[in-house]
């Protein structure tokens, strides 16, 4: 039991303390979490614990989550506290507050980490069931109930709570201890997160050609909306007959855009619809990027972004003369953990005007000597930040075939971030952003804070986005000294998005599992960020989260999205074409 009375320094224990200790030992058979102001249990036990701990030097506990300095958003669901303590068999958890709130005391025998439920439909020979790492398998956990967590949050607003875990051995006293400090922010997340929920099921087809997902499994891709104050997400779109990919919303949350594959594997369809509780995408809502006669031949839209006011769409276009394999490096692997490398090697930025139906290259980002991609709007719509590199063949002659992510046989490309005026579509001179360019690394996927002050981007050795070595950096939007963000995890940090109030960033990572999860970090007015906070239970344990994006709508602002664009050539012929301007 907890603790062994024979090991106690009896001369220092008063009878009342001994009685209280016996009560605590009985309660520790389960989990007890109380605010101890009224019963006084923690106060009465304090001299007992002090007496036990005094004669010995306590071994350190590895406190894995949350990390010291973590900042939680108000109202988020209770987190799982995770630690490693090889010799402990029971633990006390003591939480004290800088605002003098009533301390919280819990005792527990701990629970081992476990894998959540899997989706049986996404189990395949090409992937493996999620499993704990050796470190995770050695971990112990404690999750406060909703009432206890609410009390912790209420007393830690903008002032750190100190969490102390003390370990005990069966038959002995206190053996180990560690502590962290954590805070609850006053800044709400203020918006739900829209994200793509995908199976990781690479498939080998005819002649051994590998696809990230077999055509027969496309319908397993889901889109979800998550309110972080709720324990589960809500599926808003599923059972798509064709693949749909990158999505974006206008800053006001009124317009939604998404790349959708059309008939004959046409990669040039784009949906633009108003955001409503019940949304429907039909043929009339589709823009066809491809010129007439090129359906199914050319991929001309990539990383499309709706403007802040919803009037324009910015995208990467390779031009009508270049086919997919002439403008993109694409390699797929049977390794489900990192199953694809995909990045453009040629292309220009062009903008589409919804009011005129005209697509026009943007001067300053339309030089065919370069690949210009990943374009994003400033919050006021006055300038564009984008990634640029010298254009090249996706597969130079004699190049070997890459067999895994970060293989030296990948086509090498390092992007630099540039800024160019939009100037009502007239563009201007593109200038490199200091701190995010010409540093020997690949700088990509920029996202500008809603107040226009900060730029968060991905940095990796080669290519962009879903790289094992992807790290998040922050730099002043006009350029300056970059900082590696504290929120970075050990493996793949990417697909980030700012909350509408500019105080939170959501991003994806494979830190805990090859099945990608999403995390939050708080960013203050000076651009300082906090350790990563897991958004738990975003999907099944054997499915991956990508492209999480905050949407400036109420938490229940989208209930469902219906897609009624039939996979038929006749429908494609009826779709509106985006007229070329100077292109």
Predicted features along the sequence, with ranges:
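Sequence signature of WD/YWTD-type beta-propeller architectures
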Residues: 30-583
